[in-house]
Regions:
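Conserved non-cysteine loop/helix-boundary elements of the Radical SAM core domain that shape
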Residues: 1-120, 130-149
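Structural alpha-beta junctions
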Residues: 23-25, 161-167
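Flexible glycine/acidic-rich beta-alpha junction loops that bind and position SAM and/or redox cofactors
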Residues: 96-103, 120-146, 167-197
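Alpha/beta-hydrolase-fold enzymes
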Residues: 142-164
């Protein structure tokens, strides 16, 4: 979901005193590719945002539609170009093992991302989380997530591609968060998939 503009400005305003006091250097945020336009970028520049990461996930329009992402590869290209034009640091986030996505599809996504010239990327494996549509598909046998080994091998090949083009890989895999672990009872919310707490 995209935050309302008023809420965005409220949150960004709260950080400004820390930037003025040099306690915080800059702001980094993640958003959907279809949330980026010139007006938003003007506003983000005003609030000292330096890095914008786009949740690309895949560059295959069929896979994006299959996963109900709500954006297209055209949205990714347009947003990436605008972000670079406005001189923000551009980051991309991609996922490996999306429904109907093959290793070839994931490699192609990495190659497409390279052409868009982000400074950094994050690579996340798809996990089946409790209470999601993907859990329903998994329970019906309509989705099989990657194993840890498959995710590592696939990610390894993708990391090599990025490193050959001097694009920093700043994360591979998800960090342990309240989304993954129920904060009250510390039970995992992960039903299946290549999750390793390391």
């Amino acid at each position: 979901n995209i935050l309302e503009r008023e809420k965005q400005e409220e949150l960004l305003s709260a950080v400004q005193p820390y930037i003025e006091e040099k306690k915080v250097d800059s702001i980094r945020l993640s958003t959907r590719p279809d949330a980026i336009d010139k007006d938003i970028l003007h506003m983000l520049k005003k609030y000292n945002v330096k890095t914008i990461e786009l949740g690309v996930q895949s560059t295959n329009n069929y896979i994006l539609a299959r996963c109900k992402r709500g954006h297209s590869f055209e949205d990714v290209k347009k947003a990436s170009k605008l972000i670079r034009f406005y001189r923000f640091n551009l980051g991309h986030q991609m996922m490996v093992g999306l429904p109907d996505s093959t290793e070839k599809d994931d490699i192609q996504t990495a190659k497409d991302i390279i052409k868009l010239r982000p400074k950094m990327v994050r690579i996340y494996p798809v996990l089946v989380i409790k209470g999601t549509e993907l859990e329903e598909e998994f329970n019906k046998g309509d989705f099989t997530p990657l194993t840890v080994g498959q995710a590592v091998e696939r990610s390894k090949e993708i990391v090599k591609l990025f490193e050959q083009k001097n694009i920093r890989v700043i994360r591979v895999g998800l960090q342990n968060t309240d989304t993954i672990t129920d904060s009250e009872n510390k039970e995992s919310e992960v039903v299946a998939g290549p999750y390793h707490p390391a």
